[in-house]
Amino acid sequence: AAIEKNDPESIKRKYTLARTAFKKMAVLTDYFNPFQARYLNGPAISRIESETADRIIPPQGFQAIEQLIYADWNADSSFNQLAALASAMIPILQNMEKEPDRHFKFSQELVFDAIRSSIIGITTIGITGFDSPVANHSLPEAIASFEGIKQLLEIYREIFPAEKKA
């Protein structure tokens, strides 16, 4: 559905839907694709590129969009900035989807380590407000992250049904 550039409330609703969907899969993306996850959901602060200290990378991804639509929205100029931020995310998501060896990564041990890591991340970054400093959606996003973990665990429940004790 198209987004009306003069309707910030519609933009916020679409953002919330996209970010919630991302949070549901964050248990896997944060662990198996950390560089892409940082680009998609890193903090809305500039950072220095590790290879060349003289290159400053501006904020990008969901948190930069959050800052734009919840704090800095200007109907005349912000829509183009929003479109650029969102468009930059698309190839990263497409590359993650097409990643050739993605099915080899998901050993049981690594998936359970991803779950452990995700729970730590939710409790240290998610529910503290660091992950959604402007929109203040940290708790709903933490719930979405836990829903993603629950869905993942349901797969393992089917693979390893509980043993019945006699």
Predicted region positions:
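Mature extracytoplasmic or organellar-lumen-exposed domains after removal of signal/transit peptides
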Residues: 1-166
